[in-house]
């Protein structure tokens, strides 16, 4: 009898051969990756040998977790100018916290390596580079002209008053309040009304919490993705539980911003509203985008429009919410400065709640306290660049092309070489006659790519502080001292809890 080609023996031999081939291929890939890992690590060690570092794990790098700020401040004191941080065995970045180093990097046009943010905020001002970034920046700058910002002050005051009214109803001096949640809704309310022509108050809308919760989740998820040795691979990340959570949070965020765009487009279908918008000397943020024509005569694409809306929706509310919350905490823990600010505000506003544009320049001491709080608690702990060409610093040390450098704003603001007793709250650092390096204080970053909305944010900070101090004395909760932790914006590991004492 002849031997069949479909016999069990032949089939088993085929299966065995397949698995042997698969095993050898897998072994080759593992060895290839190991060699690639080794060569990359050796190249980094050689290229960055001038930048010191503490010992790190060969695979996990400096796994600092929630000890990051403590370790970083140690590095700032121990390693002048800059140091090396290993994020994994083959991924490193150079941390910069000296003004002279920072000035060099911010004077260049290197791209921001924030691709992990793209699924959420798209390619708006934060992620764009080159000619397109310049076009969008020039297009949006008029949205922050002082003629636009002036009437925003009343809108800001109204939003703050809604928050304070809610606090009065909840007021119980014996039960501290976690304030970031309320401040975040207030700043979202403000940016929605000012930049996106929103009617009503998101602070009174129970559905708004889903957006702020999504932003909170994305803050954590993106931060951990950037620090992970494995999540840099999109396939692995998308298959992970974090990847699934990220997609869901992005969906919620996009539904919110899509709704904002859709609502404004519908309003502009009304001829009266359309003519009203066109007669404005300076358009609001969203209207600029909707009316925009690029240099080639084409309208802004829907993708570009949503990216800019997503970007400003995030940066315009979450960063400012962080800043306001930490300013409140700083004043609560320094009652003598809080009282002096209150006296200054009362001398300008009396016991009323009317704040105008002109009032904002009449609060010099309050402004000094705000600036000092933003130094101690930098709302944006760091910003990064990926070098498009080699860079050499004033002391002769160099970094090659392709390396990520991180301007550690938190470290810069705590550098004892430029800020004596950096942990001490001292508003006099910002008195008019106190000189400092041009790049020693950067709460809104610096250079050509600084925060486009920095004046908007400072105005909101002043309004929030002034109106809050008229109605409440801020007291710390000694049982829950905030623990700052780095995320996309500065957060507290255990929240920011304050006791509120009603003044009137």
UniProtKB/Swiss-Prot annotation:
Localization annotation: Endoplasmic reticulum membrane; Microsome membrane
Biological processes per GO annotation: arachidonate metabolic process; icosanoid biosynthetic process; kidney development; lauric acid metabolic process; linoleic acid metabolic process; response to hormone; response to xenobiotic stimulus
Broadest EC class assigned to this enzyme: oxidoreductase
Binding positions (heme): 315, 451
Reaction catalysis annotation: an omega-methyl-long-chain fatty acid + reduced [NADPH--hemoprotein reductase] + O2 = an omega-hydroxy-long-chain fatty acid + oxidized [NADPH--hemoprotein reductase] + H2O + H(+); dodecanoate + reduced [NADPH--hemoprotein reductase] + O2 = (11R)-hydroxydodecanoate + oxidized [NADPH--hemoprotein reductase] + H2O + H(+); dodecanoate + reduced [NADPH--hemoprotein reductase] + O2 = 12-hydroxydodecanoate + oxidized [NADPH--hemoprotein reductase] + H2O + H(+); tetradecanoate + reduced [NADPH--hemoprotein reductase] + O2 = 14-hydroxytetradecanoate + oxidized [NADPH--hemoprotein reductase] + H2O + H(+)
Cited CDD domains: CYP4B-like
InterPro entries referenced in this protein's UniProt entry, alphabetically: Cyt_P450, Cyt_P450_CS, Cyt_P450_E_grp-I, Cyt_P450_sf, Cytochrome_P450_Monoox
Classification via Pfam families: p450
Propeptide residues, chain positions: 1-4
Parts of the chain that traverse the membrane: none
Keyword NADP: yes
Induction summary: By clofibrate.
GO MF terms, alphabetically ordered: alkane 1-monooxygenase activity; arachidonate 11,12-epoxygenase activity; arachidonate binding; arachidonate monooxygenase activity; fatty acid binding; heme binding; iron ion binding; long-chain fatty acid omega-hydroxylase activity
EC numbers on record: 1.14.14.80
Domain of life the protein comes from: Eukaryota
A GO-annotated cellular component: intracellular membrane-bounded organelle
Modified residues (Phosphoserine): 434
Residues spanning the signal sequence: none
Pathway field: Lipid metabolism; fatty acid metabolism
Function: A cytochrome P450 monooxygenase that catalyzes omega and omega-1 hydroxylation of saturated fatty acids. Exhibits preferential omega versus omega-1 regioselectivity and (R) versus (S) stereoselectivity for hydroxylation of lauric and myristic acids. Has low activity toward palmitic acid. Mechanistically, uses molecular oxygen inserting one oxygen atom into a substrate, and reducing the second into a water molecule, with two electrons provided by NADPH via cytochrome P450 reductase (CPR; NADPH-ferrihemoprotein reductase).
Family to which this protein belongs: Belongs to the cytochrome P450 family.
Record-given protein name: Cytochrome P450 4A2
Organism listed in the record: Rattus norvegicus (Rat)
């Amino acid at each position: 009898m002849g031997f069949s080609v479909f016999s069990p023996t032949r089939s088993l031999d085929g299966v065995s051969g397949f698995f042997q081939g698969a095993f050898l291929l897998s072994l080759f890939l593992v060895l290839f990756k190991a060699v690639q890992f080794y060569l990359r690590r050796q190249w980094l060690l050689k290229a960055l040998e001038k930048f010191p570092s503490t010992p790190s794990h060969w695979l996990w790098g400096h796994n600092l977790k929630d000890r990051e700020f403590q370790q970083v401040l140690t590095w700032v004191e121990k390693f002048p100018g800059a140091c090396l941080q290993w994020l994994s065995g083959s991924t490193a970045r150079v941390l910069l916290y000296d003004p002279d180093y920072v000035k060099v990097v911010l004077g260049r046009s290197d791209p921001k390596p924030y691709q992990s943010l793209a699924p959420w905020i798209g390619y708006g001002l934060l992620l764009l580079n080159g000619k397109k970034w310049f076009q969008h920046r020039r297009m949006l700058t008029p949205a922050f002209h002082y003629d636009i910002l002036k009437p925003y002050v009343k809108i800001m005051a109204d939003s703050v008053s809604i928050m304070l009214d809610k606090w009065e109803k909840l007021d119980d001096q014996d039960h501290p309040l976690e304030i970031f949640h309320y401040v975040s809704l207030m700043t979202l309310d403000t940016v929605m009304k000012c930049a996106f022509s929103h009617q009503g108050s998101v602070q009174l809308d129970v559905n708004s919490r889903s957006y702020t919760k999504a932003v909170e989740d994305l803050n954590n998820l993106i931060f951990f993705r950037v620090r992970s040795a494995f999540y840099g691979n999109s396939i692995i990340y998308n298959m992970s539980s974090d990847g699934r959570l990220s997609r869901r949070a992005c969906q919620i965020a996009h539904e919110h911003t899509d709704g904002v765009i859709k609502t404004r487009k519908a309003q502009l279908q009304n001829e009266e509203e359309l003519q009203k918008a066109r007669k404005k000397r300076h358009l609001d943020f969203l209207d600029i985008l909707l009316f925009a024509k690029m240099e080639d005569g084409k309208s802004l694409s829907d993708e570009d429009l949503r990216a800019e809306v997503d970007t400003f929706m995030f940066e315009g509310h979450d960063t400012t919410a962080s800043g306001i919350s930490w300013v409140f905490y700083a004043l609560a823990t320094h009652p003598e400065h809080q009282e002096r600010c209150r006296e200054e505000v009362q001398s300008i506003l009396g016991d009323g709640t009317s704040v105008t544009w002109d009032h904002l320049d009449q609060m010099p001491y309050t402004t000094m306290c705000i600036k000092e709080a933003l130094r101690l608690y930098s709302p944006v702990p760091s910003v990064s660049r990926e070098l498009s060409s080699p860079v050499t610093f004033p002391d002769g040390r160099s970094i090659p092309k392709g390396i990520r450098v991180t301007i550690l704003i938190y470290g810069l603001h705590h550098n004892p070489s430029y800020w004596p007793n950096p942990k001490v709250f001292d508003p006099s650092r910002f008195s008019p006659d106190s000189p400092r390096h041009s790049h020693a204080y950067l709460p809104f970053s610096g250079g050509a790519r600084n925060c486009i909305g920095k004046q908007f944010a400072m105005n909101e900070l002043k309004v929030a502080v002034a109106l809050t101090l008229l109605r409440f004395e801020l007291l710390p909760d000694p049982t829950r001292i905030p623990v700052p932790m780095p995320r996309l914006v500065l957060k507290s590991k255990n929240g920011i809890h304050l006791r509120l004492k009603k003044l009137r």
